[in-house]
């Protein structure tokens, strides 16, 4: 199990611990669901949970929120850093103030912590999905759906975001196994679904044998889908998504998407909080905790064991 090796008990009221969670952004079902998982752990362990984030994925918005949280002096901060390089120094301020740092979903540096080397070594743990594996899973499923031939591309946010970088890496590496498939240039959309839609229409206009698109995050996938529909190619160009809010899963049911890779964000939030609490109460903490995936398709989305991983909207 993902949290194996973590052993903690509920705090007495006099020893109540405060831990903060800063999501990548608040307006995303993934982080809403992560927050729910963290709340469940906080309730179970008697923790005061602070939750604050920006409405969009933006370093210049996340850093002031981080600074404000540091000023409240929690025992630990769980954070999904908006950039793996630009958040190193701001998070080092938390560490220097005696606040433990746990990276959830995204990471700083190379995501390998507590090794004794490097400027981004100080977080105590990284709790997340294996995003390279997730990208590979998307590639395998998309390759099958297009008959292992044709051109595909990745619709992505921007470089230097750890998770989406890794999803693209895994996708492209896995696609090398299919000689009949050519991966063409990635389209970066700055997390703007409208831009992703326009890019999809432009690629469709110039690549006559485009067979599929992999949307590496929510807005990349939604935008690509809108572009495909606007071009009149729904069902002809196969779409693979990453993440599972209802805005994606409803379009699995109607055939717009072939599949989506659902992460388990509630587990990330839960085990992230447990890790931070374990450290604050002087218990051992693994430096990395992995959570799983569920591949969702039109054929399995109504299965309760699959549907339970659809992200919460509120």
Regions found by a protein language model. Give the residues of each.
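A residue-level marker of the well-folded mature domains of exported/periplasmic proteins
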Residues: 12-314
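N-terminal export signals
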Residues: 1-9
């Amino acid at each position: 199990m993902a949290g194996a090796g973590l052993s903690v008990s509920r705090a007495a009221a006099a020893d109540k611990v405060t831990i903060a969670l800063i999501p990548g952004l608040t307006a995303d079902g993934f982080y809403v669901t992560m927050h729910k998982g963290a709340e469940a752990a906080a309730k179970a362990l008697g923790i005061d949970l602070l939750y604050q984030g920006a409405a969009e994925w933006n370093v210049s918005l996340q850093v002031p929120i981080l600074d404000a949280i540091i000023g409240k002096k929690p025992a630990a901060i769980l954070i999904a850093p908006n950039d793996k390089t630009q958040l190193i120094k701001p998070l080092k301020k938390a560490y220097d103030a005696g606040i433990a740092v746990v990276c959830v979903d995204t990471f700083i540096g190379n995501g390998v912590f507590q090794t004794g080397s490097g400027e981004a070594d100080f977080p105590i743990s990284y709790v997340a999905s294996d995003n390279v594996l997730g990208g590979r899973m998307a590639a395998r499923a998309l390759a099958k759906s297009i008959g292992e031939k044709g051109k595909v591309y990745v619709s992505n946010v921007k470089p230097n975001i750890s998770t989406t970088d890794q999803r693209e890496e895994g996708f492209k590496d896995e696609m090398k196994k299919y000689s009949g498939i050519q991966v063409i240039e990635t389209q970066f959309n700055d997390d703007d679904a409208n831009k992703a839609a326009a890019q999809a229409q432009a690629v469709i206009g110039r690549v006559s044998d485009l067979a599929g698109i992999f949307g590496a995050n929510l807005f990349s996938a939604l935008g690509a889908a809108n572009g495909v529909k606007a071009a009149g190619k729904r069902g002809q160009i196969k779409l693979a998504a990453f993440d599972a809010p209802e805005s994606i899963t409803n379009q699995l049911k109607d055939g717009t998407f072939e599949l989506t890779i659902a992460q388990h964000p509630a587990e990330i939030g839960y085990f992230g909080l447990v890790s931070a609490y374990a450290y604050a109460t002087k218990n051992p903490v693994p430096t990395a905790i992995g959570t799983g995936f569920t591949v969702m398709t039109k054929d399995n989305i109504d299965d309760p064991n699959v549907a339970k991983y659809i992200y919460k909207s509120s």
